[in-house]
Amino acid sequence: MDSAFIIEKSVVIVAVFALTMLMAMYSTWAERKVAAFLQDRVGPNRAGWGGLLQPLADGLKLFSKEEFEPNTPNKFLFVVGPAIAMSTALMTSAVIPWGDKLHLFGRDILLQATDIDNALLYIFAVVSVGVYGIMIGGWASNNKFSLMGAVRAASQMVSYEVAMGLSMIALLMMTGTLSLKEISAQQSGMNWNVFYQPVSFLIFLICAFAETNRTPFDLAECESELIGGYHTEYSSMKMGFYLFAEYANMFISSAILAILFFGGYNYPGMQWMVENVGVNTANILGFLALFIKICGFIFFYMWVRWTIPRFRYDQLMHLGWRILIPLAILNIMVTGICLLLFK
């Protein structure tokens, strides 16, 4: 392993983490702007041009706030909870293929922190660990509302992970791989998986809302019942970590949706661009294409938040266990039959 490879990977890893954090930060600004647009308001417009410096102002505010710690028997777990939630949100970005290779300085640089064969399985494993961050934070807060919110979040996320995993089986039966890069490469042009697996896409999209605790599945932190949910007792940057993790998860789930079902970094005419314009230009445009798809899904997340009311908890569980899981199993059966008959 030469030093150039170590430097290359270090730069890519730092860039990927920086991109994830930057998108999570500016998603807060976008959320407020989208809410203002849908409610016929202006939104944040004081800090910088168009309010573009508002995320920095919010970050400084959180840094400067006083930290309150409840009278809890385990202060270590109170600190570990938000750290786990934040860490798992960033770790999932490591296997996302942000584009194809760039040829720079005589080397082929992969726009991915690491390319592993079981990337999809890695994402499911890391996301499941994120449940511990919420559960530990709620339990260590020594507050009944925090604990109730944490239990809700844990049961919701575990329940919808089942449906999400089953929705992926039908897609994996078609692609034959767990590698996100290979799945993306198979969708060159407009050969997108969403046209072949619309049911898997719909189930995965609904489960993504539940996994990120977004409206209409934000039962873990609904203000009318649980004050602030599992982060009721948190303040300053500990609370900021929980909020940051939510937007980072929203960004990563949007990237996964774009890669699995909408071609990832592929776009119509990409092969022509490679042959006639150049590999680097074509692949930079591929990164921009993926970024546009991700922004489209992020806007959809925010649009849904301000247009659809919150479900009741029994409706949430009914949808997950009695509708989505049977539908995902039926989709697996239909996909298997179609592969046997037509492939």
Swiss-Prot record:
It is an enzyme of class 7 (translocase). It is found in: Cell inner membrane. One of its GO terms (molecular function) is oxidoreductase activity, acting on NAD(P)H, quinone or similar compound as acceptor. The chain crosses the membrane at residues 5-25, 76-96, 119-139, 158-178, 190-210, 243-263, 284-304, 323-343. One of its GO terms (cellular component) is plasma membrane. Keywords: Cell inner membrane, Cell membrane, Membrane, NAD, Quinone, Translocase, Transmembrane, Transmembrane helix, Ubiquinone. It is a multi-pass membrane protein. NDH-1 is composed of 14 different subunits. Subunits NuoA, H, J, K, L, M, N constitute the membrane sector of the complex. NCBIfam families: PRK06076.1-2. NDH-1 shuttles electrons from NADH, via FMN and iron-sulfur (Fe-S) centers, to quinones in the respiratory chain. The immediate electron acceptor for the enzyme in this species is believed to be ubiquinone. Couples the redox reaction to proton translocation (for every two electrons transferred, four hydrogen ions are translocated across the cytoplasmic membrane), and thus conserves the redox energy in a proton gradient. This subunit may bind ubiquinone. This is NADH-quinone oxidoreductase subunit H.
